[in-house]
Design a protein with these regions (language model features):
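C-terminal motif of bacterial Sec signal peptides marking the signal peptidase cleavage site
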Residues: 8-11
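Conserved polar/disulfide-associated segments of primarily extracytoplasmic proteins
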Residues: 42-172, 184
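Surface-exposed amphipathic alpha-helical segments
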Residues: 35-38, 182-217
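Bacterial signal peptide processing site
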Residues: 13-15
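Proline-anchored loop/turn motifs at beta-strand termini and strand-loop-strand connectors
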Residues: 24-45, 207
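A short, solvent-exposed beta-edge/loop patch
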Residues: 176-182
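Sec-dependent signal peptide recognition
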Residues: 1-3
């Protein structure tokens, strides 16, 4: 089960942050207490593309943990792709042997959305061949840097815009491969570009709290 602990301020004041760990207690972060936690299982399933009752979906449920937080007045999973208020999605994947052999920094960049040129081209090509209008257009890179943690874990943090319908959505994506090469932990923070421009410092604090912890034993 998801372990969520609330840090209380001195006295009887309201909580300032919600502190979150994944079910194995190895990935943790904090979000302002004003964010509402929502069930991310349906979102994770949609991102995977697996049919709900398939064997692949059942196996994925054993390997993948996910949660989401939304600051909107009416929190909803679909705010990941159209949010006037900040939305945070976090997931931890235990990699299969095949995935361990192919993981790379570019794979970390593309873990949720198409970011690298090769993956964006493949995404648009698939949409063209199926006759579907692509949901994501007008990609704009903002920043891209490596993340190196003290325990040997490494990853990337990329920020970019996508045009989704009539709005421009900004995404701040952090993906970290643990020091054993066994798990990938991902945090995606998003809201409309005007919201992101006004609240960038707050999002930096959330992303900066995203850490890995090596457990003893």
């Amino acid at each position: 089960m998801l372990l969520v602990t609330i840090l209380m301020l001195s006295g009887c004041g309201p909580p300032e942050f919600t502190y979150v760990r994944d079910r194995d207690g190895t990935t943790y972060f904090k979000v302002p207490a004003s964010f509402a936690q929502i069930d991310a299982s349906s979102l994770d399933l949609a991102l995977s593309g697996n049919p709900p009752d398939s064997q692949a979906a059942l196996q994925r449920a054993r390997r993948v943990w996910a949660t989401a937080f939304d600051q909107a007045e009416q929190p909803a999973i679909d705010h990941l792709f159209d949010s006037r208020a900040p939305f945070v999605y976090a997931t931890v994947h235990k990699l299969t042997e095949e995935q361990r052999a192919t993981v790379s920094l570019d794979r970390l960049r593309d873990f949720i959305l198409p970011v690298t040129e090769e993956t964006r081209t493949a995404y648009l090509t698939r949409a063209l061949h199926t006759g579907r209008t692509p949901l994501f257009t007008g990609f704009e890179p903002i920043s891209d840097r490596l993340v190196l943690l003290d325990n040997g874990a490494r990853g990337v943090r990329v920020r970019f815009n996508y045009q989704i319908g009539a709005t421009t959505q900004t995404f701040d994506h952090t993906a970290i491969l643990d020091d054993q090469g066994a798990t990938v932990s991902v945090m995606l923070i998003t809201c409309r570009s005007s919201c992101f421009a006004a609240r960038g410092a707050e999002f930096d604090e959330i992303a900066g709290s995203f850490k890995l912890l090596r457990l003893r034993g």
